[in-house]
Structure formats: structure tokens, C-alpha cells
């Protein structure tokens, strides 16, 4: 099968390319500024952006399927990089190109928590993108992962940095591993996560391509472990530095204040992430297990596979 892929130079995209190539699929990967980190000569790079119809047409020509992965965690409004533009309008552009080029199979990356009444713009725009795809005539599958972990991902890079008592420049030093908690002092609790290994996410996307049971379906995807933020931090600390690190909450109100005054990026977060941290990002993945026929890996054993790379 020849597959057109967006987001191929990213964290998840790199893993998906490796999985596609390992299964002898041919790949046309849309590449903007950054080159690919996987695939070698087995992948054809197509220069362009989500909003370049000529590049999309060139990349999709002769393809049997599209895997659309592009997404952002933080906005850069001064550069026009917003959730609305990338998640929603970018998806419209790719879906329209698939229809225009007769590529009917479309596997789409969304996010666990995407819904019309979401508290964050991140999830709202993910849901709107889903709705546009669902209204098309394409043979679509939507996958909504929880937090994706693995080597090369920004989240685990930050986790490892905190485990080593470091923080992004110019802060430099972080004596504890932080999370956002409710209440005046932050000890009022926070949401749970269901981390899923990037290799399992890649496997799911490639499996979906020729699994007819998945057409017209939305899948929630997470690992078997539902963890609080302190549990996740301590597990990472143990794997990375050999001991459980000190974990401390930052009150939600303080996180929002830091975001408002521009300090948050120095600590590696934004306002939407503060808001989302208070919700459970967990799901029942029974439907995924039934239709895909396998279980995602637990967090700690998967983490130990790559902890030395962090």
C-alpha cells in the first residue's frame, strides 16, 4: 500500500514511518521545514505545507491511503500557529485534497478528550476537525490517544529534565517535579492520565489501514495504567535517576497567572495544559482491544526500554 503521511518529521510521525517501512508499505511524507528522522530511501519526501494544494496533490497522487498526524501542543500566535489553523483548517485542507485525488482511506490522529464542550481550545479544535472528516465521503478512522510517551517526545524530555533537577533556560534548576493541583495551595488533586507508548500508537495507525472493522469508527487509546501526576513523576524519576524524586503541586491559579504574564513557557507549559491537567485523560479501551486484537503496553516496562535515551 502507498500511504501519504502528514507530520512525518514529528515524534509520532517518526514512529509511524518506521512501522510503515517495516511492513513494506511505500510512504509519501509531507515535509515542511524539518527533514525526516526515519525511513531513509524507502520514503519519498514531498516539500510543502498543509495549506499547499499543489504539494498535497503531488503527494497523494497514486496513494491508497492518508494518515494525518499533524498537531500542536502549544500555540505560537505571532507566527500564525494556532490550534484553529493547524488542527481544524489544516485537517480541512488535507481531507479536501484526499477527496480531490480519490484517496478514500483516511486514518486521523485526534486526542482523548476531544468533544464540543471541551474546556480547552486544544480539544475543541481537535473535535471540530473530527466532525469535518466525519462529514466527508471518505472511509475514515479516528484514533484518540491519551498522553503519548516515548524517546524523542517533548513530554518525556521535560520529565527527564525535571527528574535530573533541571529546567529550560533561563530557569535552569528545578528542585522538584511539578504538577498542577486544585485549591489555594495546590493540594486539592488533579486529573489522571493513561499513558500510551508511541510504538503502540504507530502500530495502531498502521493496523487500521487495512482493518475494515475500523472504517467509520472512533477509537479511544491509552495504556493499561491510569496514573495520577505524582505517580507518573515518581515512576519516571525511578527509571531515569534511580530514585523517586520529590513531587510538588503548583496551584492551578498560579499556573494560569504564570501563563498570563508569559512565564509559563520558561517552565515548559501553557494555559491550556494547566486547564487540561485538571481533567481525567482516561478511557475504556475495550472497543480498541476488540477491533485491533491486542493490548497496549504498561507504562513502566515500556519506559524502561528507552529510559537511558532520555
Give the residues covered by each predicted segment.
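Conserved beta-loop-beta element that borders a ligand/cofactor-binding pocket
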Residues: 131-161, 171, 176
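A conserved pocket-lining segment of Rossmann-fold NAD(P)-dependent short-chain dehydrogenase/reductase
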Residues: 161-196, 200, 204-208, 212-215
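Conserved catalytic-site region of short-chain dehydrogenase/reductase
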Residues: 75, 112-122, 148-153
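NAD(P)H-binding glycine-rich loop region in Rossmannoid oxidoreductase-like domains
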Residues: 35, 39, 43-93, 97-100, ...
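N-terminal Rossmann NAD(P)H-binding glycine-rich loop of SDR-like oxidoreductase domains
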Residues: 1-25
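Short alpha-helix in the Rossmann-fold core of NAD(P)-dependent oxidoreductases
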Residues: 84-91, 107, 126, 194
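Mid/C-terminal beta-alpha module of Rossmann-like enzyme folds, strongest
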Residues: 2, 202-269, 283-310
Amino acid at each position: 500500500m502507498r500511504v501519504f503521511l502528514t507530520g512525518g518529521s514529528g515524534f509520532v510521525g517518526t514512529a509511524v514511518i518506521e512501522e510503515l517501512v517495516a511492513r513494506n508499505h511505500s510512504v509519501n511524507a509531507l515535509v515542511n521545514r524539518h527533514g525526516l528522522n526515519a525511513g531513509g530511501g524507502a520514503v519519498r519526501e514531498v516539500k510543502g505545507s498543509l495549506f499547499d494544494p499543489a504539494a498535497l496533490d503531488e503527494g497523494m497522487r497514486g496513494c491508497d491511503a492518508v494518515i494525518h498526524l499533524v498537531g500542536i501542543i502549544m500555540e505560537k500566535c505571532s507566527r500564525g500557529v494556532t490550534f484553529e489553523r493547524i488542527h481544524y483548517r489544516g485537517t480541512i485542507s488535507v481531507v479536501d485534497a484526499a477527496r480531490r485525488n480519490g484517496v478514500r482511506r483516511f486514518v486521523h490522529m485526534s486526542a482523548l478528550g476531544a468533544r464540543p464542550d471541551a474546556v480547552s481550545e486544544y480539544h475543541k479544535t481537535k473535535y471540530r476537525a473530527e466532525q469535518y472528516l466525519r462529514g466527508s465521503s471518505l472511509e475514515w478512522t479516528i484514533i484518540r490517544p491519551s498522553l503519548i510517551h516515548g524517546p524523542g517526545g517533548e513530554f518525556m524530555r521535560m520529565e527527564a529534565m525535571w527528574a535530573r533537577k533541571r529546567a529550560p533556560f533561563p530557569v535552569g534548576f528545578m528542585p522538584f517535579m511539578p504538577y498542577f493541583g486544585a485549591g489555594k495551595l495546590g493540594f486539592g488533586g488533579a486529573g489522571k492520565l493513561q499513558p500510551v507508548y508511541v510504538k503502540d500508537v504507530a502500530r495502531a495507525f498502521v493496523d487500521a489501514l487495512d482493518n475494515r472493522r475500523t472504517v467509520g469508527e472512533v477509537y479511544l487509546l491509552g495504556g493499561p495504567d491510569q496514573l495520577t501526576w505524582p505517580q507518573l513523576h515518581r515512576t519516571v524519576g525511578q527509571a531515569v535517576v534511580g530514585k523517586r524524586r520529590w513531587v510538588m503541586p503548583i496551584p492551578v491559579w498560579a499556573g494560569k497567572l504564570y501563563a498570563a504574564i508569559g512565564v509559563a513557557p520558561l517552565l515548559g507549559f501553557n494555559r491550556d495544559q494547566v486547564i487540561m491537567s485538571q481533567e481525567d485523560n482516561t478511557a475504556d479501551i475495550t472497543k480498541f482491544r476488540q477491533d485491533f486484537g491486542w493490548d497496549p503496553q504498561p507504562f513502566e516496562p515500556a519506559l524502561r526500554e528507552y529510559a537511558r535515551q532520555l
